[in-house]
Design a protein with these regions (language model features):
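Extracytoplasmic beta-strand/coil segments of soluble accessory domains associated
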Residues: 38-75, 95
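Short acidic/polar hinge/loop motifs at secondary-structure boundaries
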Residues: 39, 59, 74-101, 151, ...
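Transmembrane beta-barrel wall of Gram-negative outer-membrane proteins
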Residues: 142-172, 180-227, 260-271
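N-terminal periplasmic "start-of-domain" segments of outer-membrane beta-barrel proteins
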Residues: 2-32
């Protein structure tokens, strides 16, 4: 198994750090059983903390330390630790996941615990159509159900291949054992009453036996329903006088929590570049992260509501050369 997250495309046996590769079939099996993507990672990756059941992956550390998340080598962590890196892709589009445990400086700061590189599915030479439909319910009431549908078409020739996919999931309400709706997280936001859309296209050109050109594009949007929110009681009693907060419809807000992202990456590799292995990549990522309005208390009374939104535009380039100048010696720069 070749690991690309270390930029040198080495095998697991050649890696000095503890490394795992989780195949897409394992992830799909867990997702089809009703688990959310972050819960699957917490179960399959040793040493990673259990997820918060919401949109955020805040607190999901590896062996107690922070992690970096990438999609096909493109870093998703931003300068603000907003913890939306795993709200990034539908499992339908995952080929496998590479996990490197321990501190690594290859992809910048924030990776003292390790890194998770999500490798997306690519097109095959043979024409193929994939379709997936699923539903989950706790049978509490008519809102207690999730639905998902995904489709992909891929194909190509000996020298070129591509894949186009669309995955959509609708999350309904979540309820406890008494059939009461669980309270929405109005800080990091949850997944109840939300929609997720993941559109992805990939293309690969085999220039010759050594050289390859690979393109990855993605549009991802995961957003709450603009009709559901957290009711804080009459006169905000839930935060001022110990009243009860609960989830209900009737929300009217211009700030709907969610994640929206565009990503494009172009990678060129040459296994015999003047006797060296060359891997280069240029990429662009823009995203908008929106949070719920949140009350501020002054002398026991709500004085204001505030909401935050982070807009990010990131572009970059990487170039790695790997060679063996002497037997048993590897040189990477």
């Amino acid at each position: 198994i070749i690991v690309s997250a270390n930029r040198t495309h080495r095998t697991v046996a050649e890696m000095a750090q503890t490394t795992w590769v989780i195949e897409g079939q394992e992830i799909e099996q867990q997702v089809q059983g009703g688990k959310e993507f972050k819960d699957v990672l917490a179960q399959l990756i040793p040493g990673i903390d259990v997820s918060s059941q919401g949109r955020t992956n805040y607190g999901m550390n590896m062996r107690g330390r922070a992690i970096v998340v990438l999609i096909d080598g493109v870093r998703l962590n931003s300068s603000r630790t907003d913890s939306r890196q795993l709200d990034a892709i539908d499992p339908f589009n995952i080929e496998h996941i590479e996990v490197i445990s321990g501190a690594t400086s290859l992809y910048g700061g924030g990776s003292t615990g390790g890194l998770i590189n999500i490798v997306t599915k690519k097109g095959q030479q043979d024409r193929q159509v994939d379709l997936e439909v699923g539903s989950k319910s706790g049978f509490a009431n008519s809102n207690d159900h999730d639905e998902r549908v995904a489709a992909a078409v891929s194909g190509g020739t000996d020298h070129a291949s591509g894949r186009l996919s669309v995955a959509y999931q609708r999350f309904g309400g979540w309820y406890d054992g008494n059939n009461d709706a669980l309270i929405l997280d109005n800080t990091q936001t949850g997944l109840q009453h939300s929609d997720r859309l993941d559109v992805m296209g990939t293309g690969t050109i085999e220039i010759d036996d050594n050289r390859q050109l690979q393109l990855v594009t993605q549009y991802y949007k995961s957003q709450g329903d603009d009709d559901y929110g957290l009711w804080l009681g009459k006169n905000m009693s839930a935060v001022t006088s110990g009243g009860k907060a609960y989830t209900t419809d009737g929300l009217n807000s211009d700030r709907i929590p969610g994640t929206e992202r565009h990503l494009i990456s172009l990678q060129y590799s040459d296994a015999d570049f003047f006797g060296q292995n060359l891997v280069s990549q240029v990429y662009y990522r823009d995203e908008s992260l929106t949070f719920y309005p949140f009350p501020t208390l002054t002398k026991g009374q709500v004085s204001s509501f505030s909401s935050s939104q982070q807009d990010t535009d990131q572009y970059g380039a990487k170039l790695t050369l790997n060679s063996q100048p002497l037997a048993g010696w590897d040189l990477t720069w």
